[in-house]
Amino acid sequence: MDTIHAYYTAAAEVLSPLYESGEAREIARRLLEDALGYSRSQLLVADKDTLLPPHCRERLSQQLQALGSGRPLQYVLGYAPFLQHSLFVAPGVLIPRPETEELVELVLEEAARAGYRSFVDIGTGSGCIAYALAAGLPELEGAYTLELSEEALQVAARNFDALRATTGRSVQLYRDDLFRLVESTEGALPRGLDLIVSNPPYIHPEEAAAMSPQVLEHEPHLALFAPETSPIAYYLALARLVQQGYLRPGGSLWVELNPRYAEETLEDMRRIVGPEACTAELLRDLSGKLRFVHLHYSPQP
């Protein structure tokens, strides 16, 4: 595997048992671009008989071995794209998904119209939602996140350090459990925020049989799976945050959810906040599935 062509061919073959042929070739291309520091167009026009530098060959060989064992590409590279950003990721955090990009785009659209300036991201994981919101809100006044996992906190902190270095904008991290927070009267998290945003664990454990080994064996189950006996428990707790004043009147709660429980989630969240105190709707993702709840908090004076 001394040349670009030889590595590309060999990598696609090694990955073919785990991925469809097109995806295997795409991964091989991504590895080469990362190792060589090339853009896609630079790799396309490069002489395919170009010898790979020794340090690149060693790195590519190690990465291919990791991928062959089923480790996700984003963990192997150490980063994942999210909208126009590139975020550090590691095995302790969920790999950002396209649906979550859609969620953030919806939030940013509303925030621009409403002039929202503060938010909290509950269960921040890698920090992808908070990072994109903090970078994208025109006039940011307060950015906060809540996370329980120590591994995730370390990853998010690294991403927020990078955000501060490039934009001067800061995100505050709080280590706490959502369920403990809603039962506490002394939480450190500020109240009266413009936005509450969350992509909590929402996969029912019985759905695991249909999931890929790459996800099940490598991504954190804490971030994937909802409680078996109460699969919408996180959403009920999020609704209680609204009820407890963490969201100001005129603010919005946005969540990503499991289409399987979409209607139930919407109705129970509306019930907890109070039907007369909010308007709530389900929105579909680009694949047509019910994927998001938007709850606008408008209590009567």
List the predicted regions and their residue ranges.
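Conserved AdoMet
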Residues: 33-110
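Flexible, glycine-/basic-rich loop-and-beta segments that form/coincide
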Residues: 298-301
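Residue-level signal for inorganic ion chemistry
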Residues: 31, 70, 100, 129, ...
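Mobile active-site "lid"/loop adjacent to the S-adenosyl-L-methionine
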Residues: 202-234
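Conserved Class I SAM-dependent methyltransferase catalytic core
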Residues: 228-295
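Conserved SAM/SAH cofactor-binding pocket of Class I
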Residues: 99-210, 237
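Non-catalytic accessory regions of SAM-dependent methyltransferases
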Residues: 1-44
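Conserved hydrophobic residues forming the short capping helix/wall of the S-adenosyl-L-methionine
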Residues: 15, 111, 160, 164, ...
